[in-house]
Amino acid sequence: MRDYAVIGGGHIGREIAGFLSNEGSCVLVDPNRGALNQVSSVEKIKGTVETNPEILSSSNVFVVALPGKIAKNTVAKLLKDGRKVVDVSFYQENPFIFQASVPANSVYIPDCGFAPGLSNIMAGYLFTKFDTKRIGIYVGGLPAEPRKPFLHSVTWSVEGLIDEYIRPARLIKNGATVESDPLGKTFNYQPRGFMKLEGFYSDGLRTLISTLPVQDLFEITLRYKGHLKNMKFLKEMGYFGDENEMSPRKMTERIFSQFNDTHDVSILDVISLDRKEHRIELRDYGDDHLTSMARLTGHTAAITATLLTEYPEIRGFLPPEELGKDEKKMNHILNELRHEGVKIEMT
């Protein structure tokens, strides 16, 4: 019996597999031989859980790192088979669609990446520790040295980047869930130790909308000044549209994808905004070999997978913020990230 199986051999999946191979036995599963060949220290299987059903019975914990369009079917199959699943994939539907599908002897942790994921864990901690009723999440994955005119870089997915600018952002305001046009309003914010940035409401709260009974809750995604003005212009001009036979969006994605420097910086500030303020602040930098975004996304999922091995009693549908409500588990995750060189401060 292997300790871990990572489903999906993209750059996030490969990073997860590399981390978990140092924690126990691990196999990486992907139908693309080229993706598998980029990893040398991990057992590899070419295929899927559908074409290689023996994987289901030969691994303890599964980490799904697939594109959202195909992740759902894989997750459904794993849960139907009663497996423990950590899911870093992002899909449009509410993760609660799987709540009723989780057998009593299995576990499903959705949205377990950087943001959503680590941001949820921190928010769950602040909510439980300080009984806070107002939480703000400020998050950004930025190039260390922005290039004009884009003033940004694609550290995750170019499709996901554009989606952030067109998908209505859900937030909680005065106890009610509301939607906001992401580019309808911009904010100024200066992270500690960093230059002043601008931000916009983004739709990254996910399960937090349903699990935290607070008065105010929002996520603001950060950008260098000038970027959002450019994005608003492109959106209004129709460059994010996908309705025509010759898609303006596809052309825009191709242009944006040229800005992909690995030297990025990740910022995450999760703040209780009650009368007495409490903050968790994270800073991390990419290098020649790996983006910070890939490290934080992959390692958050991988560390969470190790928790399922360490705490076999964990069961059921478990949004990431539930881990944050347990101070011991939350500290374990943050300390493991600190061990990887991620700077995290709590005040």
Which residues make up each language-model segment?
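Hydrophobic Val/Ile/Leu positions in short beta-strands of Rossmann-like dinucleotide-binding domains
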Residues: 5-6, 28, 64
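Rossmann-fold NAD(P)-binding glycine/threonine-rich loop
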Residues: 88-110
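N-terminal Rossmann-fold NAD(P) dinucleotide-binding loop
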Residues: 13-14, 71
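Beta-loop-alpha module in the N-terminal Rossmann-like domain of NAD(P)-dependent dehydrogenases
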Residues: 61-78, 92-94
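Glycine-rich Rossmann-fold phosphate-binding loop(s) that bind the pyrophosphate
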Residues: 9-10
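C-terminal catalytic/substrate-binding lobe primarily of soluble NAD(P)-dependent oxidoreductases
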Residues: 129-347
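Short acidic low-complexity segments
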Residues: 46-58
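NAD(P)-binding Rossmann-fold cofactor-contacting core
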Residues: 24-40
